[in-house]
Protein backbone atom coordinates (compact mmCIF):
# COMPACT_ATOMS: atom_id res chain seq x y z
CA UNK A 1 0.00 0.00 0.00
CA UNK A 2 1.31 3.43 -0.92
CA UNK A 3 2.05 5.84 1.94
CA UNK A 4 -0.41 8.72 2.18
CA UNK A 5 1.01 12.23 1.84
CA UNK A 6 -0.47 15.63 2.66
CA UNK A 7 0.95 19.03 1.73
CA UNK A 8 -0.54 22.20 3.17
CA UNK A 9 0.31 25.89 3.14
CA UNK A 10 -0.48 28.40 5.87
CA UNK A 11 1.01 31.93 5.88
CA UNK A 12 3.29 31.44 2.88
CA UNK A 13 4.08 32.77 -0.59
CA UNK A 14 3.53 29.52 -2.50
CA UNK A 15 7.19 29.02 -3.28
CA UNK A 16 7.43 25.90 -1.13
CA UNK A 17 4.71 24.17 -3.15
CA UNK A 18 6.50 25.11 -6.36
CA UNK A 19 9.82 23.87 -4.94
CA UNK A 20 8.83 20.25 -5.55
CA UNK A 21 9.36 20.94 -9.24
CA UNK A 22 13.03 21.74 -8.52
CA UNK A 23 13.58 18.02 -8.06
CA UNK A 24 12.99 17.67 -11.80
CA UNK A 25 11.78 14.43 -13.32
CA UNK A 26 12.41 12.62 -10.04
CA UNK A 27 9.22 14.18 -8.64
CA UNK A 28 7.23 12.03 -11.08
CA UNK A 29 8.79 8.93 -9.54
CA UNK A 30 8.07 10.22 -6.03
CA UNK A 31 4.43 10.96 -6.83
CA UNK A 32 4.02 7.50 -8.35
CA UNK A 33 5.00 5.98 -5.00
CA UNK A 34 2.63 7.96 -2.76
CA UNK A 35 -1.07 8.61 -2.49
CA UNK A 36 -1.94 12.30 -2.24
CA UNK A 37 -4.45 12.44 0.59
CA UNK A 38 -4.68 16.23 0.92
CA UNK A 39 -2.97 19.00 -1.07
CA UNK A 40 -5.16 22.07 -1.71
CA UNK A 41 -2.57 23.75 -3.94
CA UNK A 42 -2.54 20.75 -6.27
CA UNK A 43 -6.00 19.22 -6.05
CA UNK A 44 -9.49 20.20 -4.93
CA UNK A 45 -9.19 19.41 -1.22
CA UNK A 46 -11.60 20.75 1.40
CA UNK A 47 -11.39 21.00 5.16
CA UNK A 48 -14.38 18.66 5.37
CA UNK A 49 -12.39 16.01 3.51
CA UNK A 50 -9.65 16.24 6.11
CA UNK A 51 -12.12 16.18 9.00
CA UNK A 52 -13.63 12.96 7.66
CA UNK A 53 -10.30 11.10 7.76
CA UNK A 54 -9.60 8.86 10.76
CA UNK A 55 -6.81 9.73 13.18
CA UNK A 56 -3.38 8.86 11.83
CA UNK A 57 -4.74 8.27 8.32
CA UNK A 58 -2.02 10.40 6.70
CA UNK A 59 1.51 9.00 6.90
CA UNK A 60 3.28 12.37 6.54
CA UNK A 61 2.02 15.94 6.31
CA UNK A 62 4.41 18.54 4.91
CA UNK A 63 3.32 21.95 6.16
CA UNK A 64 4.82 25.19 4.85
CA UNK A 65 4.25 28.76 5.96
CA UNK A 66 4.09 30.61 9.26
CA UNK A 67 1.06 30.26 11.54
CA UNK A 68 -0.46 33.71 11.07
CA UNK A 69 -4.26 33.31 11.43
CA UNK A 70 -6.70 31.40 13.59
CA UNK A 71 -7.60 29.34 10.52
CA UNK A 72 -3.92 28.39 10.07
CA UNK A 73 -3.84 27.24 13.69
CA UNK A 74 -7.00 25.16 13.36
CA UNK A 75 -5.80 23.50 10.15
CA UNK A 76 -2.37 22.48 11.47
CA UNK A 77 -3.93 21.10 14.64
CA UNK A 78 -6.31 19.08 12.48
CA UNK A 79 -3.42 17.84 10.33
CA UNK A 80 -1.50 16.88 13.47
CA UNK A 81 -4.47 14.76 14.57
CA UNK A 82 -4.82 13.07 11.19
CA UNK A 83 -1.10 12.49 10.51
CA UNK A 84 1.51 10.10 11.82
CA UNK A 85 4.33 12.54 10.99
CA UNK A 86 4.38 16.33 10.74
CA UNK A 87 7.17 17.92 8.71
CA UNK A 88 8.01 21.63 8.94
CA UNK A 89 8.72 22.34 5.29
CA UNK A 90 10.56 25.55 4.44
CA UNK A 91 11.89 28.49 6.43
CA UNK A 92 8.50 29.92 7.43
CA UNK A 93 7.31 26.68 9.04
CA UNK A 94 10.78 26.05 10.47
CA UNK A 95 11.62 29.48 11.90
CA UNK A 96 8.70 31.85 11.24
CA UNK A 97 10.20 33.18 8.03
CA UNK A 98 9.62 36.52 6.35
CA UNK A 99 6.03 36.79 7.72
CA UNK A 100 7.42 36.79 11.26
CA UNK A 101 9.11 40.15 10.68
CA UNK A 102 5.61 41.50 11.34
CA UNK A 103 6.10 40.45 14.98
CA UNK A 104 8.11 43.65 15.41
CA UNK A 105 4.79 45.52 15.28
CA UNK A 106 1.53 45.15 17.14
CA UNK A 107 -1.43 43.67 15.34
CA UNK A 108 -3.37 46.95 15.34
CA UNK A 109 -0.41 48.76 13.77
CA UNK A 110 -0.26 46.23 10.94
CA UNK A 111 -3.99 46.36 10.21
CA UNK A 112 -4.01 50.16 10.28
CA UNK A 113 -1.03 50.35 7.92
CA UNK A 114 -2.67 47.91 5.51
CA UNK A 115 -6.31 49.02 5.62
CA UNK A 116 -6.39 52.49 7.20
CA UNK A 117 -8.27 53.86 10.21
CA UNK A 118 -11.68 52.77 8.97
CA UNK A 119 -10.96 49.03 8.98
CA UNK A 120 -13.05 46.89 11.31
CA UNK A 121 -12.97 43.12 11.88
CA UNK A 122 -15.75 41.07 10.38
CA UNK A 123 -17.20 40.46 6.92
CA UNK A 124 -17.37 43.13 4.19
CA UNK A 125 -20.46 45.37 4.36
CA UNK A 126 -23.56 43.42 3.39
CA UNK A 127 -21.78 40.06 3.39
CA UNK A 128 -22.66 37.14 5.69
CA UNK A 129 -20.54 36.40 8.76
CA UNK A 130 -18.97 33.33 7.13
CA UNK A 131 -17.30 35.67 4.61
CA UNK A 132 -15.29 37.36 7.36
CA UNK A 133 -11.52 36.97 6.93
CA UNK A 134 -9.77 34.69 9.44
CA UNK A 135 -8.73 36.34 12.68
CA UNK A 136 -5.12 37.52 12.67
CA UNK A 137 -3.14 36.02 15.54
CA UNK A 138 -1.15 38.43 17.74
CA UNK A 139 2.09 36.99 16.34
CA UNK A 140 3.28 34.84 13.45
CA UNK A 141 4.52 31.52 14.80
CA UNK A 142 6.80 28.79 13.49
CA UNK A 143 5.01 25.47 13.17
CA UNK A 144 6.66 23.96 16.26
CA UNK A 145 5.03 26.64 18.43
CA UNK A 146 1.61 25.46 17.25
CA UNK A 147 1.91 21.66 17.10
CA UNK A 148 4.59 19.03 17.78
CA UNK A 149 6.88 18.69 14.74
CA UNK A 150 8.64 15.44 13.86
CA UNK A 151 11.02 16.56 11.09
CA UNK A 152 12.22 19.70 9.33
CA UNK A 153 13.13 20.32 5.69
CA UNK A 154 14.52 23.89 5.81
CA UNK A 155 15.11 26.55 3.16
CA UNK A 156 13.42 29.40 1.33
CA UNK A 157 12.39 27.33 -0.49
CA UNK A 158 13.97 23.97 0.37
CA UNK A 159 16.70 23.09 -2.15
CA UNK A 160 16.24 20.07 -4.39
CA UNK A 161 18.95 18.05 -2.67
CA UNK A 162 17.29 18.28 0.74
CA UNK A 163 13.87 17.48 -0.72
CA UNK A 164 15.41 14.39 -2.29
CA UNK A 165 17.01 13.37 1.02
CA UNK A 166 13.68 13.56 2.79
CA UNK A 167 11.75 11.55 0.22
CA UNK A 168 14.52 8.95 -0.04
CA UNK A 169 14.32 8.37 3.71
CA UNK A 170 10.52 8.50 3.80
CA UNK A 171 9.90 6.13 0.91
CA UNK A 172 12.55 3.66 2.09
CA UNK A 173 11.08 3.58 5.58
CA UNK A 174 14.47 4.52 7.02
CA UNK A 175 13.67 7.84 8.65
CA UNK A 176 16.21 9.31 11.09
CA UNK A 177 15.27 9.87 14.74
CA UNK A 178 12.47 12.41 15.35
CA UNK A 179 13.71 15.99 15.53
CA UNK A 180 16.08 15.54 12.61
CA UNK A 181 16.69 18.54 10.34
CA UNK A 182 17.33 17.53 6.74
CA UNK A 183 20.37 19.77 6.29
CA UNK A 184 24.03 19.68 7.23
CA UNK A 185 25.30 20.19 10.76
CA UNK A 186 28.33 22.15 9.53
CA UNK A 187 28.14 25.76 8.40
CA UNK A 188 27.43 26.79 4.84
CA UNK A 189 30.97 28.21 4.59
CA UNK A 190 32.23 24.61 4.50
CA UNK A 191 30.63 24.08 1.08
CA UNK A 192 31.16 27.58 -0.33
CA UNK A 193 33.48 27.74 -3.37
CA UNK A 194 34.70 31.24 -2.53
CA UNK A 195 38.18 31.67 -1.08
CA UNK A 196 38.56 33.20 2.34
CA UNK A 197 41.96 34.71 3.04
CA UNK A 198 41.87 37.90 5.08
CA UNK A 199 39.41 36.84 7.79
CA UNK A 200 39.00 40.48 8.76
CA UNK A 201 36.23 43.01 8.28
CA UNK A 202 37.57 46.44 7.33
CA UNK A 203 34.27 47.83 6.05
CA UNK A 204 30.59 46.96 5.66
CA UNK A 205 28.92 47.49 2.30
CA UNK A 206 25.54 46.51 0.88
CA UNK A 207 25.49 44.12 -2.09
CA UNK A 208 24.46 46.81 -4.58
CA UNK A 209 27.30 49.15 -3.57
CA UNK A 210 30.14 47.12 -5.06
CA UNK A 211 30.86 44.64 -7.82
CA UNK A 212 32.20 41.75 -5.75
CA UNK A 213 35.23 39.71 -6.68
CA UNK A 214 33.71 36.47 -8.03
CA UNK A 215 36.31 34.31 -6.28
CA UNK A 216 36.79 35.96 -2.88
CA UNK A 217 34.76 35.50 0.30
CA UNK A 218 31.91 38.01 0.46
CA UNK A 219 32.56 38.72 4.15
CA UNK A 220 36.17 39.58 3.34
CA UNK A 221 34.78 42.12 0.87
CA UNK A 222 32.53 43.71 3.50
CA UNK A 223 29.22 42.13 2.48
CA UNK A 224 27.33 40.67 5.44
CA UNK A 225 26.99 36.96 4.65
CA UNK A 226 25.45 34.63 7.24
CA UNK A 227 27.32 31.59 5.96
CA UNK A 228 29.36 31.18 9.18
CA UNK A 229 26.23 30.59 11.30
CA UNK A 230 23.89 28.92 8.77
CA UNK A 231 23.49 25.20 8.11
CA UNK A 232 24.90 23.92 4.85
CA UNK A 233 22.87 21.88 2.41
CA UNK A 234 22.24 24.16 -0.58
CA UNK A 235 25.76 24.02 -2.11
CA UNK A 236 26.10 27.69 -1.13
CA UNK A 237 23.66 28.66 -3.88
CA UNK A 238 23.46 32.37 -3.08
CA UNK A 239 27.19 33.07 -2.51
CA UNK A 240 27.96 31.07 -5.66
CA UNK A 241 25.71 33.46 -7.56
CA UNK A 242 27.28 36.58 -6.03
CA UNK A 243 24.70 37.20 -3.30
CA UNK A 244 25.24 36.77 0.46
CA UNK A 245 23.67 33.96 2.44
CA UNK A 246 20.65 35.27 4.36
CA UNK A 247 20.27 32.27 6.65
CA UNK A 248 17.22 30.48 5.24
CA UNK A 249 18.43 27.00 6.23
CA UNK A 250 18.48 28.09 9.86
CA UNK A 251 21.29 28.23 12.41
CA UNK A 252 23.83 25.48 12.89
CA UNK A 253 23.47 23.57 16.17
CA UNK A 254 26.67 25.27 17.34
CA UNK A 255 25.40 28.77 16.48
CA UNK A 256 22.08 28.43 18.30
CA UNK A 257 20.84 32.02 18.19
CA UNK A 258 21.74 33.09 14.66
CA UNK A 259 21.73 36.83 15.25
CA UNK A 260 23.78 36.83 18.44
CA UNK A 261 26.27 34.39 16.96
CA UNK A 262 26.71 36.54 13.86
CA UNK A 263 27.13 39.71 15.92
CA UNK A 264 29.84 37.95 17.91
CA UNK A 265 31.54 36.85 14.70
CA UNK A 266 31.43 40.36 13.22
CA UNK A 267 32.81 41.90 16.39
CA UNK A 268 35.76 39.51 16.31
CA UNK A 269 36.44 40.18 12.63
CA UNK A 270 36.23 43.97 12.50
CA UNK A 271 39.57 45.76 12.17
CA UNK A 272 39.96 49.53 11.92
CA UNK A 273 43.73 49.68 11.52
CA UNK A 274 44.19 51.00 15.05
CA UNK A 275 45.13 49.31 18.31
CA UNK A 276 43.70 49.54 21.82
CA UNK A 277 41.09 52.11 22.80
CA UNK A 278 41.90 54.22 19.75
CA UNK A 279 40.32 51.52 17.58
CA UNK A 280 36.94 51.53 19.34
CA UNK A 281 35.38 54.61 17.64
CA UNK A 282 36.48 53.47 14.20
CA UNK A 283 35.31 49.91 14.80
CA UNK A 284 31.95 51.25 15.98
CA UNK A 285 31.76 53.32 12.81
CA UNK A 286 32.28 50.19 10.72
CA UNK A 287 29.63 48.19 12.60
CA UNK A 288 27.15 51.07 12.41
CA UNK A 289 27.19 50.62 8.64
CA UNK A 290 25.08 47.50 9.16
CA UNK A 291 21.71 48.59 7.78
CA UNK A 292 18.59 46.95 9.29
CA UNK A 293 20.30 44.66 11.80
CA UNK A 294 17.11 42.76 12.65
CA UNK A 295 16.11 42.22 9.04
CA UNK A 296 19.65 41.12 8.22
CA UNK A 297 20.44 38.89 11.19
CA UNK A 298 16.93 37.56 11.91
CA UNK A 299 15.41 37.67 8.45
CA UNK A 300 13.71 34.31 8.95
CA UNK A 301 13.78 33.92 12.73
CA UNK A 302 12.21 36.83 14.57
CA UNK A 303 10.20 34.48 16.87
CA UNK A 304 13.53 33.26 18.30
CA UNK A 305 14.96 36.75 18.71
CA UNK A 306 15.49 37.41 22.45
CA UNK A 307 14.40 41.05 22.31
CA UNK A 308 11.38 40.74 19.97
CA UNK A 309 8.20 42.58 20.97
CA UNK A 310 5.49 40.54 22.64
CA UNK A 311 3.07 41.96 20.09
CA UNK A 312 -0.10 41.35 22.08
CA UNK A 313 -3.15 42.37 20.19
Segments (PLM) and residue ranges:
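Iron-sulfur (Fe-S) cluster-binding modules
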Residues: 1-62, 72-73, 77-85, 104, ...
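Short glycine-rich anion-binding loops that position phosphate/pyrophosphate groups of nucleotides
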Residues: 66-68, 92-94, 158
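Extracytoplasmic/secreted cell-surface and envelope-processing proteins
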Residues: 71-72, 96
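Short gly/pro/ser/thr-enriched loop/turn and capping motifs at secondary-structure boundaries
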Residues: 92-99, 118-119
